[in-house]
């Protein structure tokens, strides 16, 4: 197994697909990396030489924020919004949808399981 950016990449998959296992690298970014380095996209990870794996590792380290650094950056951005007490920060703090979705009905994923309220008594 090749280890890139602290992630064990599956060896039996194509390079483009395997790179998407790294948090912060999607299909488009993986395609850019592979074409920039001149690696055939249909090649499997197990067929890559150590030098090619090293090139991929260096390209990712140089050009992209991935894994722990990216997670930390996103968490810090959310924390900054919460500290500013702006509208988006307050929504994050309350655990409600941030981007203007309705909450009268729906938003169950963000709000959590529905809390039962006393129904109409007969």
Swiss-Prot record:
Native organism taxonomy: Bacteria, Pseudomonadati, Pseudomonadota, Alphaproteobacteria, Sphingomonadales
Keywords linked to the UniProt accession: Ribonucleoprotein, Ribosomal protein, RNA-binding, rRNA-binding, tRNA-binding
Organism: Zymomonas mobilis subsp. mobilis (strain ATCC 31821 / ZM4 / CP4)
Protein name: Small ribosomal subunit protein uS13
Keyword Endoplasmic reticulum: no
SUPFAM superfamilies, per database record: S13-like H2TH domain
Stated family: Belongs to the universal ribosomal protein uS13 family.
Biological role: Located at the top of the head of the 30S subunit, it contacts several helices of the 16S rRNA. In the 70S ribosome it contacts the 23S rRNA (bridge B1a) and protein L5 of the 50S subunit (bridge B1b), connecting the 2 subunits; these bridges are implicated in subunit movement. Contacts the tRNAs in the A and P-sites.
Single GO MF annotation: rRNA binding
HAMAP family: Ribosomal_uS13 (MF_01315)
Pfam families in the cross-refs: Ribosomal_S13 (PF00416)
């Amino acid at each position: 197994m090749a280890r890139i950016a602290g992630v064990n990449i599956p060896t039996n998959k194509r390079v483009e697909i395997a790179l998407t296992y790294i948090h912060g690298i999607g299909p488009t970014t993986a395609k850019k990396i592979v074409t920039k380095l001149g690696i055939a996209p249909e090649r499997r990870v197990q067929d890559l030489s150590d030098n090619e794996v090293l090139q991929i590792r260096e390209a990712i380290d140089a050009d992209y924020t991935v894994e722990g650094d990216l997670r930390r950056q996103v968490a810090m951005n959310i924390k900054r919004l919460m500290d500013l007490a702006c509208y988006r920060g307050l929504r994050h703090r309350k655990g409600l949808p941030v981007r203007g979705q309705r909450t009268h009905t729906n938003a169950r994923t963000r709000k959590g399981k529905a809390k039962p309220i006393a129904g109409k008594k007969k």
